[in-house]
UniProtKB/Swiss-Prot annotation:
Catalytic activity entry: ATP + H2O + 4 H(+)(in) = ADP + phosphate + 5 H(+)(out)
Keywords per UniProt: ATP synthesis, ATP-binding, Hydrogen ion transport, Ion transport, Nucleotide-binding, Translocase, Transport
Enzyme class: translocase
Binding, ATP: 233-240
Gene giving rise to this polypeptide: atpA1
Protein name: V-type ATP synthase alpha chain 1
Biological process terms in GO annotation: proton motive force-driven plasma membrane ATP synthesis
EC number: 7.1.2.2
InterPro entries, sorted: ATP-synt_VA_C (IPR055190), ATP-synth_a_Xtn (IPR031686), ATP_synth_asu-like_sf (IPR023366), ATPase_a/bsu_AS (IPR020003), ATPase_F1/V1/A1_a/bsu_N (IPR004100), ATPase_F1/V1/A1_a/bsu_N_sf (IPR036121), ATPase_F1/V1/A1_a/bsu_nucl-bd (IPR000194), ATPase_F1/V1_b/a_C (IPR024034)
HAMAP family: ATP_synth_A_arch
Annotated NCBIfam families: PRK04192.1
Function: Produces ATP from ADP in the presence of a proton gradient across the membrane. The V-type alpha chain is a catalytic subunit.
GO MF entries: ATP binding; proton-transporting ATP synthase activity, rotational mechanism; proton-transporting ATPase activity, rotational mechanism
């Protein structure tokens, strides 16, 4: 279709207004100026279109041509996504570097998926088979870890006329389907508009936890596969390290990491670390299951708004194959700031703190695309997409609009605390403020799959930490010596729980990841010390004798015990029981 060319009448930073655009539609992608800068129509008034331009607009002036492509902002979905690094509108950064150097040249046009790379396609269906949207046509081994399942594109159903094994690029024809509307060609790639969620049969209630290997998360505030979580915290409290830890060790088959408006160095860290680290499940490099979207703080603001949608659309595509996906967005605050900037330039009525009135609905749109679903297709496979967003409230103020709008939507809140971070307690997740609404689902799963007293131990530990907070308040007023020995013991056990269990070193080879069976044994050992010590106190043993037991050091060092030697934690528990019994028999006054 030959569309009329419009003309620029106003340029205001990333916002460009063009007239003569009556043939264009809302959310169409347009090319602006002689350099053909990429932009998207975000508002239409008569023949005038307001366009957010995803590139630097300096040098652009009134009278410059604007051409609409007639299509919405879409991503290319096919082999070549894994291990790739894209910007916010899915331009491949490695291909841009090869073509134009270290910085993205304005107006550069590079296909998202390589048109040269050849993939070997193995069909799982044959000519004559009846297929519908979502059915798996065949497989491409994308990396040594990920098998890319080629699906029937949305909106197509019918009978396969031909489907051939062989080596293809993403745009080569691999077969044909006869539909009601005629014959459709099949390729390894499909396109999908980023602002529209991909279809599925139905949503399921999430129940299995997404194991992260982070003790404070898995034990106290678990997130399910297909769940939503947010990590708000002030600057320097460790949001990015928490996100990196989850991306490294989460029990997901594919990780989509969106660096949205954060520092470039943080994406560099990911690029440097992930290829070196081994996935505990496959033994392969973590990069072989990761898609990176880098939209750093020095890239155009408008592209931040798109980067979140680009990332979640890629996540949904892999979810449709039947995979479990973990999506990290770091940080949604920068995305909200981009919304605020565009809203201000559009002269819309501002809401709270200048954010647009539709901030809450946009956030909800994003998080609602997560979930545990039955995918389209005749085999009824399950897929899960877990969304975890970091929020950076200015000054750590959790009452600001982005945090509040996020908390209304997500079910897990990991509140990072600057006081804990200053005390070098990492991950700095505050156990008194944080919560998980998935506990009633995850608890029975843990009792069944890990240990039958998991929920009971968790409740005891939480009660102890709550009691510690109350006792510390009293100790600050009247001094620790005024507390009874039993209360001082509670403070010591809670301290052990905090320092020996909740604290975790992200940069230690062993402590960076703790499997569930190790977490259970460690928690049990700490709480067992509390129970046994209380018995000893009641039998007349002095508190200092209990606290000086050498076995306490072994409990503290249990976090550094390798997964292979996990049974040695049980030995520590036996030694603890024996030492306390010896203390009672030597120095205690046993009840008659």
């Amino acid at each position: 279709m030959d569309l009329k060319t419009g003309r620029v009448v106003k340029v205001s930073g990333p916002l460009v207004v063009a007239e003569g655009m009556e043939e264009a539609n809302l959310f169409d992608v347009v090319r602006v100026g002689d350099e053909r800068l990429i932009g998207e129509i975000i508002e239409m008034r008569e023949d005038k279109a307001s366009i957010q331009v995803y590139e630097e607009t300096s040098g652009l002036g009134p009278g410059a041509p604007v051409v609409t492509t007639g299509a919405p902002l879409s991503v290319e979905l096919g082999p070549g996504l894994i291990e790739a690094m894209f910007d916010g509108i899915q331009r491949p950064l490695d291909a841009i570097e090869a073509k134009a150097g270290d910085f993205i040249t304005r107006g550069i046009d590079v296909p998202s998926l390589s048109r040269e790379k050849v993939w070997h396609f193995n069909p799982t269906k044959k000519a004559g088979d009846k297929v519908e949207t979502g059915d798996i046509l065949g497989l491409v081994q994308e990396t040594s870890v990920i098998e890319h399942r080629i699906m029937v594109p949305p909106g197509i159903k019918g009978e396969i006329i031909s489907l051939n094994e062989g080596d293809y690029t993403v745009i080569d024809k691999i077969g044909e389907i006869k539909t009601d509307k005629g014959i459709e060609d099949l390729t390894l790639m499909q396109k999908w508009p980023v602002r529209r969620g991909r279809p599925y049969k139905r949503k399921l209630n999430p129940s299995a936890p997404m194991v992260t290997g982070q003790r404070v998360v898995d034990t106290f505030f678990p997130v399910t596969k297909g769940g939503t979580a947010c990590v708000p915290g002030p600057f320097g409290s460790g949001k990015t390290v928490v996100q990196h830890q989850l991306a490294k060790w989460a029990d997901a088959q594919i990780v989509v990491y969106i660096g949205c408006g954060e520092r470039g160095n943080e994406m560099t860290d990911v690029l440097n670390e992930f290829p070196e680290l081994k996935d505990p499940k496959t033994g392969e490099s973590l990069m072989k299951r990761t898609v990176l979207i880098a939209n750093t703080s020095n890239m155009p603001v408008a592209a931040r708004e798109a980067s979140i949608y680009t990332g979640i659309t890629i996540g949904e595509y892999f979810r449709d194959m039947g995979y479990s996906i973990a999506l990290m967005a770091d940080s949604t605050s920068r995305w909200a700031e981009a919304l605020r900037e565009m809203s201000g330039r559009l002269e819309e009525m501002p809401g709270e703190e200048g954010y647009p009135a539709y901030l809450g609905s946009r956030l909800a749109e994003f998080y609602e695309r997560a979930g545990n679903v039955i995918c389209l297709g005749q085999d009824g496979r399950e897929g899960a997409l877990t969304a975890i967003g970091a929020v950076s409230p200015p000054g750590g103020d959790l009452s600001e609009p982005v945090t509040q709008a996020t908390l209304r939507i997500v079910k897990v809140f990991w509140g990072l605390d600057s006081q804990l971070a200053y005390r070098r307690h990492f991950p700095a997740i505050n156990w008194l403020n944080s919560y998980s609404l998935y506990l009633d689902k995850v608890g029975p799963w843990m009792n069944e799959n890990v240990a039958e007293d998991w929920v009971e131990l968790r409740q005891k530990a939480m009660a102890l930490l709550q009691e510690e907070a109350n006792l510390q308040e009293i100790a600050r007023l009247v001094g620790i010596d005024a507390l009874s020995e039993e209360d001082r013991l509670k403070l010591e056990v809670a301290k052990s729980l905090r320092e020996d269990y909740l604290q975790q070193n992200a940069f230690h080879d062993v402590d960076t990841y703790a499997p569930l069976n190790k977490q259970y044994r460690m928690l049990k050992a700490v709480l067992q010390f509390g129970d046994e010590a209380r018995k000893a106190l009641e039998s007349g043993v002095y508190l200092k004798d209990i606290l000086n037991l050498p076995v306490r050091d072994k409990i503290a060092r249990a976090k550094y015990i390798d997964e292979k030697d996990i049974l040695s934690i049980d030995e520590i528990s036996k030694e603890l029981t024996k030492d306390i019994e010896d203390l009672i028999s030597k120095g205690g006054i046993l009840d008659a």
